[in-house]
Amino acid sequence: MQITRDKWSKNFSEWFDWVLREGEFYDYGRYPVKGMGVWMPYGFKLRQNIISIIRNLLDSTGHEEVLFPLLIPEDLLRRESTHIKGFEEEVFWVTKGGSEDLDVKLALRPTSEVAITTMENLWLKSYKQLPKKYYQIVSVFRYETKATRPMIRLREITTFKEAHTVHETYDDAQRQVEEAIEIYKKIFNNLAIPYVLSERPEWDRFAGALHTYAFDTIMPDGKVMQIGTVHHLGQNFSRALDFKIQKKDGSLDYPHQTSYGISDRAIASVIAIHGDDHGPILPPSVAPIKVVVVPIPAKNEEGTQQVMKYSIEICEMLNKNNITCVTDQDTEKTPGEKFYIWEIKGVPIRLEIGPRELASSTVFIKRRDNLKSYTVKKEEVVNKVKEVLNEIQEDLRKRAWESLKSRIEYANDIEKAKNILENNSGIVDVPWCGSKECGLKIEELTNARVLGYPIEDRKVNDKCVICKMNAKTVLRVAKTY
């Protein structure tokens, strides 16, 4: 087997659909509601492993998990006018209960800022209770009118982690924004997912936010996908819902809030970014199965049974050392057929055990990511597998970051930027004066989407590509999902 990435990069959409189906991650397009898929057992385990990383990082930083109702009354959703304008065309409405029309329409939760603020208004009365950090992992619903895509553009987003925090001051809320960004960096580092971090421009902020910071990654086809956002909401939602707290000086005022979310797209990026033409290569940190043992049959039944017994023994050794392992005991498939199956599931390590390994009390180790192989003694297999898993995790991370950085270019001319995006995709940084008019014109002329600008100071000794005034920073532009 050779490492090739033609199908993965040039026909990514087909590759992704094939992997989800054949790898038994996610069944999409066959459930009879557009934009809604079914998590299959193997994919659900991957999802749970990723959620576990998210939960651990949130729990360890003082976040408390809650669970809110799915339904939000229309009059409540409309309390924050900017917010509802941003979501109105995407809301699913429940208008009947049985055969009776409802007095008030109920929205299927598109996001929960208004719902959670409503209850915080009842629970939180004093600065002494702040800061307060809640989160939930739930389904949200968006009536997507564009072409839907499995895990990437859905009408039911089944893995929506939304955190909501409350603070006495603007500055403390900004400190929380910075903490959220650091949490997300740790999450994506655990997933070996590279990203660019930008502040969204004013015309592309989350509806109702003062500032929106976004994590974007580049998919194999060169398109960019948003994988996480952090919002400084200021007092917009607390003011709209008349939510006040007593401050240290005894006065009453509206608290400041933040919210931040990650969705199924993070899982999609894990499956997609580390792949090749044979399927995904799951990072060991989240792989449902870290090691698969494939027994190689002997020339006779007795020898084959001994090989199977030895294979099971090796797998049990690994499981006892918290390395998730399975032995493929299917006697009707050839080793080659088994290799194909486990490659498309993205299992990081394959152990091949046949008569030769049985006779020498050794194990043959094959890496999924770079095809390197090792033969080790039985007593060394646990330590060697741990070592190789760590190497795979780090190598996947390095390769992904190198790939992302290689696909970010600079262009001080709008035609050059357009050509790069049409031919290579990825991200193009263009010098920008900071005005909305020029930003929207950049989007129009490149036929692409503005991602935002770097949150760190980015000095540019160039002219804005539109108005030719001195540039204040760069604006990131990309073809997006």
UniProtKB/Swiss-Prot annotation:
It is an enzyme of class 6 (ligase). Keywords: Aminoacyl-tRNA synthetase, ATP-binding, Cytoplasm, Ligase, Nucleotide-binding, Protein biosynthesis. GO terms for biological process: prolyl-tRNA aminoacylation. It is found in: Cytoplasm. Its EC number is 6.1.1.15. The keyword Cell division does not apply. It catalyses: tRNA(Pro) + L-proline + ATP = L-prolyl-tRNA(Pro) + AMP + diphosphate. Pfam families: HGTP_anticodon, ProRS-C_1, tRNA-synt_2b. GO terms for cellular component: aminoacyl-tRNA synthetase multienzyme complex; cytoplasm. GO terms for molecular function: ATP binding; proline-tRNA ligase activity. Homodimer. NCBIfam families: proS_fam_I. Belongs to the class-II aminoacyl-tRNA synthetase family. ProS type 3 subfamily. Consists of three domains: the N-terminal catalytic domain, the anticodon-binding domain and the C-terminal extension. Catalyzes the attachment of proline to tRNA(Pro) in a two-step reaction: proline is first activated by ATP to form Pro-AMP and then transferred to the acceptor end of tRNA(Pro). PANTHER family: BIFUNCTIONAL GLUTAMATE_PROLINE--TRNA LIGASE (PTHR43382:SF2), PROLYL-TRNA SYNTHETASE (PTHR43382). This is Proline--tRNA ligase. It comes from Saccharolobus islandicus (strain L.S.2.15 / Lassen #1) (Sulfolobus islandicus). The lineage of its organism: Archaea, Thermoproteota, Thermoprotei, Sulfolobales, Sulfolobaceae.
